[in-house]
Amino acid sequence: MAPNSSVTVGNVVFDNNAALALIAGPCQFESRQHAFDMAGALKELTARLGIGLVYKTSYDKANRTSLSATRGAGMDAALPVFDELRKEFSLPVLTDVHTEEQCAIVAPHVDVLQIPAFLSRQTDMLVAAAKTGKVINVKKGQFLAPWDMKNVVAKITGSGNPNVLTTERGASFGYNTLVSDMRALPVMAEIGAPVIFDATHSVQQPGGQGGSSGGERRFVETLARAAVAVGVAGVFIETHQDPDNSTSSDGPNMLPLKDMPALLERLMAFDRIAKGR
């Protein structure tokens, strides 16, 4: 089974040749109120700009640098709120899963299951996610070549699910550093599935602060503009009202919410040029 070249999530279309779509939200689910504030702000912004939005957040960040790092509120607290967000804002929701068992538990509460980069080769994980029937977004491992994603996608489609998104989030470049090779985007597009560029994790410095990861937020727009100029189905951006004081260890690479409007306007302009729209 080949992957679908166009994947629809709610009313959002991901297609390498269609208008740019957005996956955005805070790194971690912090509270019901915070989730409602963020989802409401992003829904209002994207409706005004005319860009499709999938809201993302994580109930658990299982691959933190330190044992003492804040991981999130957990499934019991987050999943009921995901249901509320979908109903209240008519927004599709994406969250990541970390074990095979979580896939079936989480699937009824979201629209997209995300496979973290560190788990992108785990066959049993990919099969379990695929069998839920949900759209699957796979982050390309920092250790994988872009052409290796063909095998990752095949594990999902071979399990009966053609609705796959692939996300580029940088490749390991020495210690505590990632680099984005824009050649990866057309290579991944050749697989046949929509390609997403993760603009915020691509500037991450894994483990760069000793007990947590660092990041170079100032390069988010640079990389996002480059990726959109190449041509992608969507961009993935973690954002927060106050990232430097958030509970997330991804604070250094999250984009302040106030900076989102200007960035999205520029990216949409680049997208129109790249796709001749």
Curated annotation (Swiss-Prot):
- Annotated pathway: Carbohydrate biosynthesis; 3-deoxy-D-manno-octulosonate biosynthesis; 3-deoxy-D-manno-octulosonate from D-ribulose 5-phosphate: step 2/3; Bacterial outer membrane biogenesis; lipopolysaccharide biosynthesis
EC assignment: the record states 2.5.1.55
Checking InterPro entries in the record gives: Aldolase_TIM, DAHP1/KDSA, KDO8P_synthase
Stretch forming the signal peptide: none
Pfam families from the xrefs? DAHP_synth_1
The Gene Ontology terms for molecular function here are: 3-deoxy-8-phosphooctulonate synthase activity
Q: What is the protein's name according to its record? A: 2-dehydro-3-deoxyphosphooctonate aldolase
Organism from which the protein derives: Mesorhizobium japonicum (strain LMG 29417 / CECT 9101 / MAFF 303099)
